[in-house]
């Protein structure tokens, strides 16, 4: 190492040589007893630490660190992160030049230490005017595989994935809501490591790879949000999936009351899953053990504890498009005045522009267009074979949402009024026939528009938001990245 670097200790801006860098790292190793090796573009400090016995820490113990000054190294970083707890391994990503790449991964020995690091070191001023970002690191080992023939069984999918990719550990397949003999057209494949999953994803490039003669969809599976153990210890609501569409809330309540009459407070069923609320946690945990794997109306059910999330913070993230689609088994506890909880799933990212100027400006058009060369091969497809992120319009999102749930298209009814200054103001009422007999017979926003396009777009946005908040109905594309144990 012969490059020069800035020594930022105590906020200094003193140039230090490569020899000084090496001396500082050697001093750190001598002081801590940790080893340090550099391989594959990263420098590993520890892993395991001296005297460590047993397996590595479980998932959830590692944090990601971003916005690290490029001339800052382990001798400065390790003492900062040791404030949160014992470091199992510190991995600093390195450039060939000897500078770091601006980010690192820190694995602690416990999840509690990792959570503490996030709380005390996120947005920490590591140098004057330089703030680092710290968040949980998810070592993703699962892939979403879509467009799978619905008649294929778990064993067939597992065997096929083992043939075409390496390191397959398990396959998660959910039965169709309407026909339990078929799957939902997608599966989650778990690999032995993140590297194995990444290699499989690279091999299964959409459009170039087929299974059983079908072009499949491949993407990373987004793991559920982690809920801290202390919060989970207070949960007294069970999440029940794989129910028959025809199964009623009364039937579910009766089945869960069998092991202890009167234990169930109420049941909220949504399509093929439900939330079962108990008066106390002990009964909920006991019922989970008894009922998991049992049959109700001929369907083998899965029962887990529902995962609570913070209502206010979650909705703020949700409306900003920052929350992952963890849908069904996330439950937002309502205020005490409210009689029912609200379930939560991810809304499509919708256009915020409702000013009558729907035509993109020239720069916007340029960003979303590509040259169409003569002789380019075109393939006819259905819009419903696309992903939801291909749509910028809430109207298209709503149509797509209904189709994915096997509903009839939404019906739009136009109404008008006149403002005090003589303007004609418009509003659409939307009826979704498939759920029109439920608690919500139609959807109509509380604002009026001056153009047809804006009125229709606003009504569709309002309907999507309301569906998501009040019903959280299953949608394949919106839920395609969810995985559960």
Swiss-Prot record:
Disulfide bridge map: none
Highest taxon in the source lineage: Eukaryota
A GO cellular component entry from the record: cytoplasm
Major subcellular site: cytoplasm
GO molecular function annotation: RNA binding
InterPro entries assigned to the protein according to its UniProt record, in alphabetical order: HnRNP_R/Q_splicing_fac, Nucleotide-bd_a/b_plait_sf, RBD_domain_sf, RBM46_DSR, RBM46_RRM1, RBM46_RRM2, RBM46_RRM3, RRM_dom
Keywords for this protein: Cytoplasm, Differentiation, Meiosis, Oogenesis, Repeat, RNA-binding, Spermatogenesis
Signal peptide (UniProt feature, chain positions): none
Gene Ontology BP terms: cell cycle switching, mitotic to meiotic cell cycle; female meiotic nuclear division; male meiotic nuclear division; oogenesis; spermatid differentiation; spermatogenesis
Domain RRM: 61-139, 141-223, 236-308
Subcellular location: Cytoplasm
UniProt-listed CDD domains: DSRM_RBM46, RRM1_RBM46, RRM2_RBM46, RRM3_RBM46
Subunit structure and binding partners: Interacts with YTHDC2, MEIOC, MOV10, CNOT6L, DDX4, UPF1 and PABPC1.
Known role: Essential for male and female fertility, playing a crucial role in regulating germ cell development by ensuring the proper progression of meiosis prophase I. Regulates mitotic-to-meiotic transition in spermatogenesis by forming a complex with MEIOC and YTHDC2 which recognizes and down-regulates mitotic transcripts for a successful meiotic entry. Required for normal synaptonemal complex formation during meiosis, binding meiotic cohesin subunit mRNAs containing GCCUAU/GUUCGA motifs in their 3'UTRs regions and positively regulating their translation.
NCBIfam families: hnRNP-R-Q
Name the record gives this protein: Probable RNA-binding protein 46
Classification of source organism: Eukaryota, Metazoa, Chordata, Craniata, Vertebrata
Encoding gene, per UniProt annotation: RBM46
């Amino acid at each position: 190492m012969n490059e020069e670097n800035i020594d930022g200790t105590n906020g200094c801006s003193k140039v230090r040589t490569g020899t000084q860098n090496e001396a500082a790292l050697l001093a750190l190793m001598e002081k801590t007893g940790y080893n340090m090796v550099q391989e594959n573009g990263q420098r590993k400090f520890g892993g395991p630490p001296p005297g460590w016995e047993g397996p590595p820490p479980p998932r959830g113990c590692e944090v990601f660190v971003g916005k690290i000054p490029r001339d800052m190294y382990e001798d400065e970083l390790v003492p900062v992160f040791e404030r949160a707890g014992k470091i199992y391994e510190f991995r600093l990503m390195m450039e060939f030049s000897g500078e770091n790449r601006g980010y690192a991964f820190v694995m602690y020995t416990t999840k509690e230490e990792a959570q503490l690091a996030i709380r005390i070191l996120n947005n920490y001023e590591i140098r004057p005017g330089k703030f680092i970002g710290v968040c949980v690191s998810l070592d993703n080992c699962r892939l979403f595989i879509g467009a799978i023939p619905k008649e294929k069984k778990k064993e067939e999918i597992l065997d096929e994935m083992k043939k075409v990719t390496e390191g397959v550990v398990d396959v998660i397949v959910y039965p169709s809501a309407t026909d339990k003999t078929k799957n939902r057209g997608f599966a989650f494949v778990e690999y032995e490591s993140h590297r194995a999953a990444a290699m499989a994803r690279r091999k299964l490039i959409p459009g170039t790879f087929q299974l059983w003669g079908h072009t499949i969809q491949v993407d990373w599976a987004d793991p559920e949000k982690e809920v801290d153990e202390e919060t989970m210890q207070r949960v007294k609501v069970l999440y029940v999936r794989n129910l028959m569409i025809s199964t009623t809330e009364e039937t579910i309540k009766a089945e869960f009351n069998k092991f202890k009459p009167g234990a169930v407070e109420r049941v909220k069923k949504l399509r093929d899953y439900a939330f079962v609320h108990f008066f106390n946690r002990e009964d909920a945990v006991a019922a989970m053990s008894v009922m998991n794997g049992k049959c109700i109306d001929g369907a083998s059910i899965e029962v887990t504890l529902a995962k609570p999330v913070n209502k206010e913070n979650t909705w703020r993230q949700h409306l900003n498009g920052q929350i992952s689609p963890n849908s069904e088994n996330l439950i937002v506890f309502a205020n005490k005045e409210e009689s029912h909880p609200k379930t939560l799933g991810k809304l499509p990212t919708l256009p915020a522009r409702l000013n009558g100027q729907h035509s993109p400006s020239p720069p916007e058009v340029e960003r979303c267009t590509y040259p169409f060369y003569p002789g380019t091969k075109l393939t006819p497809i259905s819009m419903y074979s696309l992903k939801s992120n291909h749509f910028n319009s809430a109207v298209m999102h709503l149509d797509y949402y209904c189709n994915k749930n096997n509903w009839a298209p939404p019906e739009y009814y136009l109404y008008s009024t006149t403002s005090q200054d003589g303007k004609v103001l418009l509003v659409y009422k939307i009826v979704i026939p498939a759920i029109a007999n439920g608690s919500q017979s139609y959807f109509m926003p509380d604002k009026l528009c001056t153009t047809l396009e804006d009125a229709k777009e606003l009504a569709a946005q309002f309907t999507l938001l309301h569906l998501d908040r009040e019903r959280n109905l299953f949608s394949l594309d919106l839920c395609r990245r969810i995985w559960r144990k």
